[in-house]
Amino acid sequence: MEPIEQQLTELRTTLRHHEYLYHVMDAPEIPDAEYDRLMRELRELEAQRPDLITPDSPTQRVGAAPLTAFNQIRHEVPMLSLDNVFDEESFLAFNKRVQDRLKSTENVIWCCELKLDGLAVSILYENGVLVSAATRGDGTTGEDITSNVRTIRAIPLKLHGDNIPARLEVRGEVFLPQAGFEKINEDARRTGGKVFANPRNAAAGSLRQLDPRITAKRPLTFFCYGVGILEGGELPDTHLGRLLQFKAWGLPVSDRVTLCDSPQAVLDFYRNVEKDRPTLGFDIDGVVIKVNSLALQEQLGFVARAPRWAVAFKFPAQEQMTFVRDVEFQVGRTGAITPVARLEPVQVAGVLVSNATLHNADEIERLGLRIGDKVVIRRAGDVIPQVVNVVLSERPEETRPIVFPTHCPVCGSDVERVEGEAVTRCTGGLICGAQRKESLKHFVSRRAMDVDGMGDKIIDQLVEREYVHTPADLFRLTAGKLTGLDRMGPKSAQNVVNALEKAKATTFARFLYALGIREVGEATAAGLAAYFGTLEALQAATIDELQKVPDVGIVVATHVFNFFAEESNRDVIGQLLAEGVHWPAPVVINVQEIDSPFAGKTVVLTGSLSQMSRDDAKARLVALGAKVAGSVSKKTDLVIAGEAAGSKLAKAQELGITVIDEAEMIRLLDA
């Protein structure tokens, strides 16, 4: 090794060591000036020998040339969100649900952490070297922010220590400390730049810069809180153990992590953090509470898009006072008419609020609200502004009552309020432009029919120009007709037509969800599809039969029954099928009468499938008598591993469960 190579290696090792002490251990050994001197020395040596620069060198954080757009990264393991609770009663109910599902009367050991108010990211290390990073995005696909993440000094470009997995994807939060936020805004005011409303917006704006050199100038930091992909290595079997292992490898972890052995201990942690919140130096909006045992997490599983073993306990939202200048009425997808207060703009929790939901007529009556009133505004969950109460002692003389419409403000149809419901609805159905727009936007959305490129503005124009009345009309659109829309050229129009054609191939569950039946979300649609198997069987089902589907009660069953009883709905479904919308047909077989390797088996899918979608695979497996589970356990009979299979594959191998690949699955399906 040349002398300069030895110098470079020693300098990089020294700098990484001090980065670890500063960002992870919070115990710097040297002044910032000494760190800067070492960095300058490294830069000078690398300038002499650029052929010896390595990708994981501390100098390589500054970033490359600006990007023109962000590429997309598909999360191999979805980045799920958490359910929220906002008070002690709700948390205790969550705790009881967990105990009931575990069939245990013993206290659960909870791992409690801060809920950081930043931007969720995933970072992939291969053999300990940072290779990619992405935003959460929609949970399935995020933006490639690798170049920007490399500029954040708290994030190691190379992990250190022993037993580092071959592939390790860590999840965490990028955020901006309060001091850094104030400095950014101070500089912006001085130079005439953009002033951010709050640290979270500043962090998101900094991380999503197309020019990494701008990101490098922002004092972003990072805390790690979870794992996605894990291949070629092992992690401890508790959440806290994993956090400690991450810290040992050089990843920053919050020091406010506590194990709690009772619900009361969790509440004490929550109250202590809430008390300390103003002095933390960075924004949080609650605490995150997770079952510490990975085995129990696996046993609890997931519901829809959130784990059953974790919850975010949010702090009470910040409140401000302002005036209601007017009330307008919006019409939603199902005809629900929602009153919205137009406010004198006011800053609430760092965000300028000018509108607030009033929910329904009962809420207006409860508040005793009049137009012109002074009100208290809260951001519920720090997201949706709402009116908390009227400041009656300061009611102006000139206020006027809020009159709920007797006719739809959009189409003029009669409105009705069903006895026992709080919501007033427009009776116009799809003749109502507002309902038509919202229904069509739902129909083409990513988790429904997934029509790429069919955005809200296109739907608005299609409805306003009377080109489209029902979802079936979408599939009759031509490139020529679309070209006439604003900002829609021939190429874009053809892309939309192609996307519509592609969307015709769907799944029964997606199709049901896309129809927009009241109270039928993704999970319920999947349950209905799996239980009945065919559209014909579902349409013929009685209310009693519908209630046999897991998680379907009398209310949902009635909505589903009424939807299919409506002739106009059946007509639209018929038109959609006539236009070529289709999904894999289930083969209804008596499990006891067939010789299928899947019959009666509990099967788990993991990794990415290339020959068919995961939904298609599930549908075909279920049709052959399999039960498709979401996690691997001792009860699992078979694991089907696609590309980039992760922890489920490792778990299956550990338990000695039979594993086959996608090609073998297809061979067996077609046998």
UniProtKB/Swiss-Prot annotation:
Q: Where does Zn(2+) bind?
A: 408, 411, 426, 432
Q: Which organism is it from?
A: Salmonella agona (strain SL483)
Give the encoding gene's name: ligA
Instruction: Write down what this protein is called.
Output: DNA ligase
Chemical reaction(s) catalysed: NAD(+) + (deoxyribonucleotide)n-3'-hydroxyl + 5'-phospho-(deoxyribonucleotide)m = (deoxyribonucleotide)n+m + AMP + beta-nicotinamide D-nucleotide
**E.C. numbers:** 6.5.1.2
Q: Which cofactor does it need?
A: Mg(2+); Mn(2+)
Gene Ontology terms, cellular component aspect? cytosol
Top-level taxonomy: Bacteria, Pseudomonadati, Pseudomonadota, Gammaproteobacteria, Enterobacterales
Q: Name one matching Pfam family.
A: DNA_ligase_ZBD
Per the record, the GO terms for biological process are:
DNA repair; DNA replication
Active site positions: 115 (n6-amp-lysine intermediate)
Residue ranges occupied by any BRCT domain in the UniProt entry: 593-671
Magnesium: is it a keyword of this entry?
Answer: yes
